[in-house]
Amino acid sequence: MSLIVKICGLSTPSTLDVALQAGADMVGFVFFPPSPRHLELARAQELGAQVRGRAAKVALTADADDETLCGIIEALRPDLLQLHGKETVPRIREIKRRFGLPVMKAIGVEIAADLADLPRYAAVADRLLFDARPPKHATRPGGLGVPFDWRLLTNLSVDIPFMLSGGLAAGNVDDAVRITRAGGVDVSSGVESAPGVKDAGMVRDFIRAARAAETSLREATSHVP
């Protein structure tokens, strides 16, 4: 299976076009006001129309209520909802029932105990995203540019696909993929020149590095007896 590359926190037509032309599989749009990447619905509608089926559209939310989710879905028409807050298993189940969209649940990781509830989340989500657990007093649940110990995911066994996030950049994505064997990588701050400001060259470099990491891993595993 091919490695999924997601560029998250896109907010301008030009950087979205760069991500699409460089071959991103998923493009993420943030709907969380404390984030410098937050989008108003009118802008989200414009950017969503620009995608035109060239990549999967992902709406990132955190503990959003039904009214908020309804507005986001109407504006963006996402292919996937990324739940990046403290959504419970019953809440995830309710969101899927009400809106009929697949869900990717973000799991904050710092220590092995943070993975204890994986079976419960895997039973209701369609995909998992492992991100660094934010510091105690952080105002945002992600996009902080901080990695976690990827070795915690070594030999991970879950029944649904998972992606990796948290502190990824062109310079470390090869190690990240090799250690975790993640099915996808998700980057935001690692392709920015300033918080919320995507850098076209960094976006291209990351996607290129992720594809190279995918090739290296495939070649390495093909030689395992």
From Swiss-Prot:
Keyword field: Amino-acid biosynthesis, Aromatic amino acid biosynthesis, Isomerase, Tryptophan biosynthesis
InterPro entries in alphabetical order: Aldolase_TIM (IPR013785), PRAI_dom (IPR001240), RibuloseP-bd_barrel (IPR011060), TrpF_fam (IPR044643)
Reaction it catalyzes: N-(5-phospho-beta-D-ribosyl)anthranilate = 1-(2-carboxyphenylamino)-1-deoxy-D-ribulose 5-phosphate
Pathway: Amino-acid biosynthesis; L-tryptophan biosynthesis; L-tryptophan from chorismate: step 3/5
Annotated GO MF terms: phosphoribosylanthranilate isomerase activity
GO biological process, one term: L-tryptophan biosynthetic process
Record EC number: 5.3.1.24
Stored Pfam families: PRAI (PF00697)
EC top class, as a word: isomerase
Statement: the UniProt record of this protein carries the keyword Secreted: no
Top-level division of the source organism's lineage: Bacteria
Family: Belongs to the TrpF family.
Protein name: N-(5'-phosphoribosyl)anthranilate isomerase
The organism of origin for this protein: Nitrobacter winogradskyi (strain ATCC 25391 / DSM 10237 / CIP 104748 / NCIMB 11846 / Nb-255)
Gene name, Swiss-Prot/TrEMBL: trpF
